[in-house]
Amino acid sequence: MADTKMKALERLKEDLEKVYLGPLWEKLGKMVTPEPDHEVVPYLWKWETIRKHLLEAGELLRLGRESERRVVYLQNPSLLKHGLIGYSTNTLYVGVQLLLPGEVAPAHRHSQSAIRFIIEGEGAYTAVDGERTYMERGDLILTPAWTWHDHGHEGTEPVIWMDGLDVGLVRNFAGSFFEPYSEDVFPVAGPHNGSTFKYSTGALRPVTDRKRKGYPSPLIAYKWKTTKQVLENLSKLDPDPYDGYAVDYINPLTGRSADLRIGTTMQKLTPGMHTKAHRHVHSAVYHVLDGEGYTIINGVKFEWSKGDFFILPPWSWHEHVNTGEGDAHLFSINDLPIMELLDLEREEAYNKNGGHQSIIDVFQPTL
């Protein structure tokens, strides 16, 4: 009797598959998992490898409508097999962009939110809906979803920055739209760096903006010199046990994330600092602004130095160590705003071994 029933169930399963139906009694555990289930792997790229290939692209590729952006993106190896091109995590895309003197990256807009974090060089600007903001190393620049934006270079040296977009998130929601502007440059509107003049402190609001909507953020550029000073002030207090001295970039009108969908964080690790391990649902991609050290992710040691990038997958144990003689600054983007909005975010402390993982392996980057 049991064998007959099993054979009947197997036939039923085959019949269901033929008409694109499925037996939930067999697949429930795949759909509703006890903990987050994903295929994102941690990975690290050395800066010299990225920069070498990016400069080579600079010699071979000229900007224009045929190639609007000269970017090398960070591909999560485990997601490529599913055709998820350009995915660094399930939700986030990170690329590294090069702009040469005299070039213009043509104006366009898209559904994806985007941030720029400046890595090296000066003399270039990003224009958002016509407001030009000149970029310096360590600055965070916002280009909110569906805003016209272009980049231009009036300086004399290559400028390189990090791009962060919510490509995976928007694709999963089937919400992607893209539109090129009719000209290479969107018409200039207002004074250069205007939003910085108005909102540089983040704690004061011009009376003329009392009725301004909260999104997008009225501040386009978050200057490194301001962020660094805040971190210096914060260093007079006790550090966070998991992130050291860390700040989130916020919208000065709402007090929430600077971008509605992409979280941005800068953290400072003082010499010898070893944070405790924890894990959370949101994923992140890190860039090492300066310093040297390592991060342990699920027991694997990822050694980093100035310029490197590394991926933190969702729900992964992690802790940071500064092995250098000076401060280390780690910039990161994350999908925390969306996880909080959807009430999916959770955080858990690692309670074994005094809050520190044992190292079981050391990651070897591909050079």
Regions found by a protein language model. Give the residues of each.
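Contiguous mid-protein beta-loop-alpha structural module that forms a pocket-lining wall or clamp
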Residues: 145-199
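Conserved metal-binding segment of the jelly-roll/cupin
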Residues: 128, 134-156, 161-166, 297, ...
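C-terminal functional regions that serve as terminal interaction/effector modules
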Residues: 2-48, 253-256, 260, 271, ...
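A short beta-strand-loop-beta hairpin characteristic of the jelly-roll/cupin
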Residues: 100, 104-137, 144-147, 152, ...
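A short, N-terminal "cap"/entry segment at the start of jelly-roll beta-barrel domains
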Residues: 2-89, 180, 186-261, 265, ...
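A short hydrophobic beta-strand segment most commonly corresponding to one strand
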Residues: 115-117, 142, 156-176, 286, ...
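Short histidine-centered beta-strand/loop micro-motifs
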Residues: 83-88, 104-110, 152-153, 258, ...
